[in-house]
Amino acid sequence: MMLHAQHMPGQPGTPSLVFLHGFSGDCREWQPVGEQFHGCSRLYIDLPGHGGSAAIPVGGFADVIRLLRATLISYNILKFWLVGYSLGGRVAMMAACQGIPGLCGLVVEGGHPGLQNEQARAERRLSDGRWAERFRHEPLTEVFHDWYQQPVFASLTAQQRQALTALRSQNNGETLAAMLEATSLAAQPDLREALNALAFPFYYLCGERDSKFRALAQEVAATCHVIRNAGHNAHRENPAGVVDSLAQILRL
């Protein structure tokens, strides 16, 4: 089995760019950024529970990474960079730390490296469980209205919140809930030590108004690019700034 994806071919001999979206996004999320890199092959993946992969069930990160590897093989992608936002960034970090063949470099935007104690994991497990129940049983417009009131999204304007709520409400609440539970931050190990031992380039992107993830970026051995005029979802709020950073990282 493989994940649904959109593939845009590039010039032979260059590493592919593999983009992983955040929770409740889909393969379109990264395209305004990725399509500025025409020379590279680009693969935009729908993670399980989302978009064209909505019906694919997973029990945890191991299943997601297995599907990711199968998808890369199906497209004959042998050398690539992983570029992931939030949930996609956590999947990318997990894959990198476990060792995924062909990975040349890692770019994470606003991805959490992991909680550091059991109390924090227990609290997160309860929180994610409550959100999952809401996604299963309540209208998505109501759930996402509240979702985007969370402190991490404090930099969004009312208009941006309204637009995101309308966009994300097109998802399937049941499959979102299942993916939220399967890949909860509570189920993710603390990756700091493993990330610090990576043998390939690791870059971290965060919005200048995203104080939480700017602080987390200092806890991993990554070169950090701060994206101006942006909060947690920097590639949506300032795509040109993220394109500039990726161009520097990839030397394109």
Swiss-Prot record:
Organism domain of life: Bacteria
Protein name, as recorded: 2-succinyl-6-hydroxy-2,4-cyclohexadiene-1-carboxylate synthase
EC number: 4.2.99.20
The entry's keywords: Lyase, Menaquinone biosynthesis
Organism: Salmonella newport (strain SL254)
An MF annotation (GO) of this entry: 2-succinyl-6-hydroxy-2,4-cyclohexadiene-1-carboxylate synthase activity
Residues annotated as transmembrane: none
Protein's pathway: Quinol/quinone metabolism; 1,4-dihydroxy-2-naphthoate biosynthesis; 1,4-dihydroxy-2-naphthoate from chorismate: step 3/7; Quinol/quinone metabolism; menaquinone biosynthesis
Organism lineage string: Bacteria, Pseudomonadati, Pseudomonadota, Gammaproteobacteria, Enterobacterales
